[in-house]
């Protein structure tokens, strides 16, 4: 006795995905000529939306003052801490400590691009003598690296 109508047993007989109407193919298709956009005007044209336009009201980005600037001399480099390098050595992800290059750091996901410049910072403690390829190094990091081995860090 399944005479009770429930949400899970209603059958409409209609297709699940209704096909969208093809626009602009003559008056016989129901959406021909103006394709449901009305006659003329800005909204009838393609690329209708003007970014930041608020219907004649002055837009938010012209109401607010200009602030700051982007410096052309900004240092753009990846920062690698000595603690990160020591952690990778301890977890045996870096086997060859005699040549830690940009490629090695990139493959391990420490830096996001091989083209980036690298700055080594002395955050953390380094227990292993390593040879690191870098572009910049802090004084504390350089002292830790040179303390462990004679020829260790190399500027690219």
Curated annotation (Swiss-Prot):
<protein>
    <recommendedName>
        <fullName>Large ribosomal subunit protein uL15</fullName>
    </recommendedName>
</protein>
<keyword id="KW-0689">Ribosomal protein</keyword>
<feature type="compositionally biased region" description="Basic residues">
    <location>
        <begin position="34"/>
        <end position="43"/>
    </location>
</feature>
<comment type="subunit">
    <text>Part of the 50S ribosomal subunit.</text>
</comment>
<dbReference type="InterPro" id="IPR036227">
    <property type="entry name" value="Ribosomal_uL15/eL18_sf"/>
</dbReference>
<feature type="region of interest" description="Disordered">
    <location>
        <begin position="29"/>
        <end position="48"/>
    </location>
</feature>
<dbReference type="InterPro" id="IPR021131">
    <property type="entry name" value="Ribosomal_uL15/eL18"/>
</dbReference>
<dbReference type="GO" id="GO:0003735">
    <property type="term" value="F:structural constituent of ribosome"/>
</dbReference>
<comment type="function">
    <text>Binds to the 23S rRNA.</text>
</comment>
<keyword id="KW-0699">rRNA-binding</keyword>
<dbReference type="Pfam" id="PF00828">
    <property type="entry name" value="Ribosomal_L27A"/>
</dbReference>
<dbReference type="GO" id="GO:0019843">
    <property type="term" value="F:rRNA binding"/>
</dbReference>
<dbReference type="GO" id="GO:0015934">
    <property type="term" value="C:large ribosomal subunit"/>
</dbReference>
<dbReference type="InterPro" id="IPR005749">
    <property type="entry name" value="Ribosomal_uL15_bac-type"/>
</dbReference>
<dbReference type="InterPro" id="IPR030878">
    <property type="entry name" value="Ribosomal_uL15"/>
</dbReference>
<comment type="similarity">
    <text>Belongs to the universal ribosomal protein uL15 family.</text>
</comment>
<keyword id="KW-0694">RNA-binding</keyword>
<dbReference type="GO" id="GO:0006412">
    <property type="term" value="P:translation"/>
</dbReference>
<keyword id="KW-0687">Ribonucleoprotein</keyword>
């Amino acid at each position: 006795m399944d005479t009770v109508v429930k949400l899970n047993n209603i059958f409409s007989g209609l297709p699940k995905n209704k096909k969208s109407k093809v626009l602009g193919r003559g008056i016989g298709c129901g959406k021909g000529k103006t394709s449901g956009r009305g006659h003329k005007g800005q909204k009838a044209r393609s690329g209708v939306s003007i970014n930041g336009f608020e219907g004649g009201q002055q837009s938010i980005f012209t109401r607010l003052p200009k602030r700051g600037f982007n410096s052309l001399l900004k240092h753009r480099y990846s920062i690698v801490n000595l603690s990160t390098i020591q952690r990778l050595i301890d977890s045996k992800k870096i086997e060859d400590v005699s040549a830690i290059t940009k490629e090695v750091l990139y493959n391990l996901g420490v830096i996001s691009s091989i083209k980036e410049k690298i700055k080594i910072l002395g955050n953390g403690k380094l227990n292993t003598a390593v040879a690191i390829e870098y572009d910049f190094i802090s004084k504390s990091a350089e002292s830790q690296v040179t303390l462990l081995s004679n020829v260790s860090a190399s500027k690219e």
